[in-house]
Amino acid sequence: FYDLSRPLLDVDERALALCREQFARLEEIKEYNQLKMLKAFTDCRVGGSHLVGTTGYGMDDAGRGKLEEVFAVLTGSEAALFRHNFMSGTHTLSVALFGVLRPGDRMVAVTGRPYDTLAGVIGIDGTHYGNLMEFGVQYDEVDLLADGTPDLAGIARKCRGAKMCYIQRSRGYAARPALSLEQIEAVSHAAKAVQPDIIVMVDNCYGEFTQKQEPTQRGADLMAGSLIKNPGG
């Protein structure tokens, strides 16, 4: 139709051949998670009554409650908050952090400095009022190693006595690789080996449904993400 040259088409075919194995792996993960999603809807007995609009005034919101039950099953979690009231990923992370941390607690960011918007929530940059550090929460961090992998020895050293081990799974705005579930599990083991009651929290933005399990099934105690990314399609 466009009179493309044969050499150009050959380049296209070779490029697709190089990517075919990775595409097949991603398709397999997609199909697995699709079936997992359908099974969760079935097991949670989602029905037409859960899709009817309601004000929620003077009664419960069965649809919202059922959606959160489904998401808890999908992530292997005890419970979930899965609702449009969270305006962004940073808002969701903030709610989780303020919900868990108290004055005098110490959080350790073990994947280096968090991205800018969350740095303001924590109080690292000193430009936002009402941040965690102003609330009396202490902050420390462990940089990634030169190859972009977690510094397990440094994590074990700094997480002793800490309340939270904070993991940013995606690269965010940095030029480093995202963390795999295997790496998240290794970080969790390193932190809990020195502080068994530490809360391992994962910023899972961009990470939902990219593998067959979620961080809460591989050592994380608390996970937060963004509905405008993977879960929202």
Regions found by a protein language model. Give the residues of each.
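Conserved PLP-enzyme active-site core in the AAT-like
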Residues: 4-14, 19-20, 27, 36-50, ...
